[in-house]
Structures are given as structure tokens and as C-alpha cells.
């Protein structure tokens, strides 16, 4: 169905210079998919088709981390001054305006790429849209420790935000 839409768009365009090549490409993709000839796509479309597939466990981890940070940032934004002070006192500098800074762009690129795709392409976790998402330092291990602690709290957050004590518990696990 998508290939038929693409064919119609190519035919309707005023500029037909590349139409023949584009139609050939659409037909190739369509025939490869319909015929089960997936091997043909990387042969013909070098650079577009590749062997990389995101690890589903890493996708799940990134979703859990983004979900956790959504709760942290949203709750903190609604805390009173006294509650914010309580978090900062309980955690130290990590408790002062806690924000998700992403993943290390040099060593955690798959995690960063998954996060960017979720936010920018799929429109998920829109609170992070427009952010760099490159922490410039290793972050996965810290986020995973926090997410592990958060999972026990998460199931009780139906219809309510995190409390200062819950946030302190999660943020403290960043250093554990």
C-alpha cells in the first residue's frame, strides 16, 4: 500500500527528472518485500540498507529511562520551594533542578540514537524534544541504577506525581 502511494506521488510531481529511477526503486522494494527477497535490498541499496538493528533490550531500557526522567522532571517542576529544598538537601547537587542530559555521544551512541529516534521521529517523550541528548560522559549505568529503583515506585504512580522522598530515593541511586 505504501509503495502504491509513493508511485502515485512520483507520477503526480511536476519535476519528472528522477521519476524513472524512483519508480524502479519503489518497484524493487515492493517486489523484494512481496517475494521475501529481503537479501536483495542491501545489495541494491548499499548504505541505506545495513545489518544494524537496535537491540530490543536497549530500546526497552531507553523507554524506561525516558519514562523515569519524565516523572522526575514533571514532579520537580510542580514541587513547592520547600519540597525542592528537601530534594536538594537529601541528594546534594544532583537534587538541584534534576534534568535528563542524555547518553554519552562517544560510547553510548546506540542508546542516544534510540532516544533521539523515539523523541524526534516517533514523537514520544516530547518533554525532551529539541534537547541535545548528549551527556558528554557515561550515563547508562547511572540511569539503569536509577531506573531499577524507579520501577518499584512507578507502579504506584497511577494518578499522582512522585513525592520528594521518592525522588530522593531514585536520585540517590545514581551514585550507588
Region spans (language model):
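Detector for methionine-enriched segments
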Residues: 1, 23, 45, 49, ...
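Charge-dense, extended regions
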Residues: 108-176
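Extended alpha-helical segments
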Residues: 1-30
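Context-gated lysine
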Residues: 7, 11, 24, 57-58, ...
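Extended alpha-helical scaffolding regions
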Residues: 28-124
Amino acid at each position: 500500500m505504501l509503495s502504491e502511494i509513493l508511485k502515485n506521488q512520483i507520477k503526480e510531481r511536476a519535476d519528472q527528472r528522477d521519476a524513472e529511477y524512483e519508480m524502479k526503486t519503489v518497484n524493487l522494494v515492493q517486489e523484494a518485500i512481496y517475494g521475501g527477497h529481503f537479501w536483495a535490498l542491501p545489495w541494491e541499496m548499499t548504505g541505506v540498507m545495513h545489518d544494524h538493528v537496535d537491540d530490543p533490550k536497549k530500546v526497552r531500557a531507553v523507554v524506561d529511562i525516558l519514562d523515569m526522567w519524565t516523572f522526575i522532571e514533571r514532579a520537580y517542576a510542580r514541587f513547592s520551594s520547600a519540597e525542592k529544598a528537601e530534594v536538594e538537601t537529601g541528594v546534594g547537587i544532583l537534587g538541584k533542578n534534576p534534568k535528563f542530559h542524555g547518553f554519552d555521544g562517544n560510547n553510548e551512541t546506540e542508546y542516544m540514537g534510540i532516544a533521539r529516534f523515539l523523541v524526534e521521529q516517533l514523537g514520544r517523550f516530547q518533554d525532551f524534544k529539541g534537547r541535545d541528548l548528549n551527556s558528554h560522559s557515561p550515563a547508562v549505568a547511572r540511569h539503569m541504577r536509577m531506573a531499577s529503583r524507579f520501577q518499584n515506585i512507578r507502579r504506584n504512580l497511577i494518578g499522582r506525581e512522585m513525592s520528594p522522598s521518592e525522588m530522593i530515593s531514585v536520585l540517590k541511586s545514581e551514585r550507588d
